[in-house]
Amino acid sequence: MTDPAFLETNEADVVVSYDRDRSLQDIVRQQSRIAPQATAIVFGDERLTYDELDRLSDALAVHLAELGIGKGDVVGMLLPRALNTVICMLSILKAGGVYVPLDPAYPEEHLAYVAAECAPKVVFVDAASALRASSVPDLRGTIIDAGVVIGRLTHSAVAKRRAIEVTGSDPAYIMYTSGSTGRPKGVTIAHRSIARVVLDQNYIDFRRDDVILHAATIAFDATTFEIWGALLNGCTLAVMPDADFSLARLAGVMRDTGVSMTFLTTGLFNLFADYAGGDLPRLRHVLFGGDVGSPVHARRFLQRYPGCRLSNAYGPTETTVFAAAFTVPPDFAETELPIGKAIAHTGICILDEELRELPPGREGQLAISGDGLAIDYFRSPERTAEKFVMVATEAGPKRCYLTGDIALLQPDGTVSFKGRRDRQVKINGKRIELDEIETALRNDPALSDAIVLCHLQGPALKRIVAYLRPRAETALSDPAFPQEVMSRLRATLPVYMIPSATVVVDAFPLTPAGKVDRASLLPPPVEAARPDAEAVASTQAETLLTQLWSEALGAEGIDLDRNFFDLGGTSLQLLQVHAGLEARLGRAVDVVALFKHSTIRELARHIEGKSQNTARSIAATQRAALQRKTMSQFRRSAS
């Protein structure tokens, strides 16, 4: 119980300290007693106070208990970003359960694998994802429409919730990431690991009047920082509606809700620094991460928002969102951004190949210790034992997570990222195991083998390329073959893991030792135009779009009738085109139009106000519906 005398103090002076033994729901309940009428969540026109959040999640927790949910039981969340999603999340914890975020945009095979491994007793859905849930054969738990049940509970008497003893060491969620074995792996995170990243911290200072933006998909661990950073500190969580995403819309939501803190993936942050305009008077701290930071964009952002603090944050899912952070000073002039120093309740050391601690100034594998470490890889003791090991450090033996990242520790404790030991890459904040893509491709009956590489296109843009060796010789000259393979791959892997380019080969080059010579597999050029194509723009709109596409794709002479995505374009590149288009035209452009009209000629006609014939319009609408699924992978995008 909270001391009444404690409640009489000025709520602005109350600071909830980190206690590694407390559960998340206990801390949120304390916040609801400190300031019951403070706004907990904003979602469009909806607002929920801390008292309302506490009471609604209590009622839903009772409902879950009636369905048999108890301590340690898994509950799935096949939901978008929404106010109800946060209520469901908190109610699961109050019932003693463990939540598993499931992205409705993921392919059926991915969802089926996760469902079969976790076997959730209950799965929350909304009206849009209910049909999706019914199509996943291994999703056998009780299906609950979150909106319907919460709507009913809103007008019902609150039943008394039976107290479930949950401590900081108990699991709170299981989040699935890309796995090198060809299957996603579940990372089990404890309550204390979540609390530790947002309470009593050295890289960030939460205030009660802060508004934290929630723009990540719930299956991305940045959500952990957004939701629990707000609720455990008595702040307001501003949930960005899960609709068509654009930089202008992102900035608009931030401005309208008075966002003061946000996290952006590195790629999205770079676009934000390049294109986001307008006044954001309450914005005081932006964090970015998920890929190597760009000093140029950091400086550009600080010039545009000189009063805003900017931090480059680093951390694998296995260490709960962040493990290190670097605050970029206004006068930063270096050519590389470090990933910073260890955040509070976290340890960092650099190890050699024998897992011995190295002194500052030596490169080695980055290992992380502290309260942020995951409990395990769900139902995978061998993998857990491989990545979570005891290391003899100067401070004594510590349980550490081996990141696979190569880094260098400076004498002052600052860490610089130097590369990877394996074939894992990060694109738009998403961790991608290239081996997982290769495994999926090698299961395709039309292929005898496949190699997947990540190439740099320009100074920073990463491009996943699949090199395909078909079984049938006729496929070598079949232009439809790569598209057919990628179509089958989309039924297996999330959109963000689908290669943006393919190369069909009759054989792979070999080293003298007889192994595939991956270094000899060069990136294909961006195929901009067919030899017989009319690539010359004839209108102002076509000229402008050709320039924007060339800048985004790194190609010249683009065919006016080639689909943006067929040219290897990604959703992040499309956002770049959209932002540039709005900036050049000086007016808003519906981002959906770029999906619906995905060639230069079609989009130019749309911009000029010219109509398409009915058949082409229907085809464009159908194509847009498929291609817009990629936007759901953004986080602060979403992505």
Language-model segments: residues:
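AMP-binding/adenylate-forming domain of the ANL superfamily
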Residues: 1-174, 189, 196, 294, ...
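AMP-dependent adenylate-forming
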Residues: 1-14, 23-24, 123-164, 194, ...
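Short amphipathic alpha-helices and their capping loops
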Residues: 22-27, 306, 402-403, 409, ...
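Glycine-rich loop motifs involved in handling phospho/adenylate chemistry
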Residues: 44-48, 74-83, 102-109, 215-216, ...
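Regions immediately C-terminal to embedded phosphopantetheine-bearing carrier domains
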Residues: 71, 171, 528-639
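Motif- and composition-driven signal specific to adenylation
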Residues: 77, 83-91, 97-116, 158-358, ...
